[in-house]
Design a protein with these regions (language model features):
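N-terminal polar alpha-helical/low-complexity "assembly arms" that mediate subunit docking
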Residues: 1-178, 182-185
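Carbohydrate-recognition loop of C-type lectin domains
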Residues: 93-95, 171-229
Length: 229
């Protein structure tokens, strides 16, 4: 029997075909979520738990803040951890206590942005220079390095790559990909890692951040501490 374009039977069969196609598409998509190359969002997170890999949260931009005293003192001057310095847009808080030795006029300490994400990146040296709560004897505070290292939550692409690399991290013999995996596990801002060994017992790790940026001294120190732990 030939069905005309408007035949009710033909229209009914077409409606059934649409439902069947959608169901099979949904089944195929659900099956793909079990595969690392296709998994997304929560499904990818679930695959990561099989290898104890979790999605990296947002990271905070870091910098170094230099505090300058109005005069040299006869005693040690302490600047508490959490002291905030701002540029009117973002605020950085010192990571730990800073003790300026007696007779000295200045001291430096690392500081992290109070808001996670890329919002704290790319402020040049000297741009973060206003103390939120003025302190006795402190005449000036400013960042001495460009603010870098802030990133958003880890993307599916980055997480999938770390899951692929995770088995290399089980080794304690220091294979190349183990260094890559651990370096990328420090922060979601780490885009790429290159590892070389110029001489036996010596390993050089080169890091590139998201957006093609070079890591700051503070970020490199974080990675070095993580790899040395």
């Amino acid at each position: 029997r030939t069905l005309a374009a408007g035949d009710p039977v033909r229209l009914y069969l077409l409606s059934l075909a649409a439902v069947i196609i959608q169901q099979r598409t949904a089944v195929n998509l659900a099956a793909q979520q079990n595969l690392l190359s296709y998994a997304q969002d929560g499904y990818l997170d679930a695959l990561g738990t099989l290898l104890s890999v979790t999605r990296l949260a947002e990271s905070r931009a870091v910098t170094t803040i230099k505090f300058t005293l109005s005069q040299a003192l006869a005693t040690v001057y302490t600047i508490p951890a959490g002291t905030e310095v701002t540029n009117g847009v973002v605020t950085f808080a010192t990571d730990h206590e800073l003790n300026i030795e007696k007779g000295k006029l200045e001291g430096s300490v690392t500081a992290s942005c109070t808001v996670a994400g890329t919002i704290g990146n790319d402020y040049l040296a000297g741009q973060v220079n206003t103390i939120v709560k003025p302190m006795t004897f402190v005449s000036k505070a400013e960042n001495t390095t460009i603010t870098t290292g802030g990133s958003e939550a880890e993307s599916d692409e980055s997480l999938a790559e770390r899951i692929r690399l995770a088995p290399n991290g089980f080794s304690v013999a220091g294979p190349e990909k183990a260094y890559v995996y651990h370096a990328k596990s420090v922060s979601s801002s780490v885009l790429d890692v290159s590892v070389t060994s110029p001489t036996p017992g010596e390993v050089d790790v080169y890091v590139l951040l998201a957006g093609g940026e070079l890591p700051s001294k503070e970020t490199l120190e974080q990675i070095d501490a993580y790899l040395s732990d």
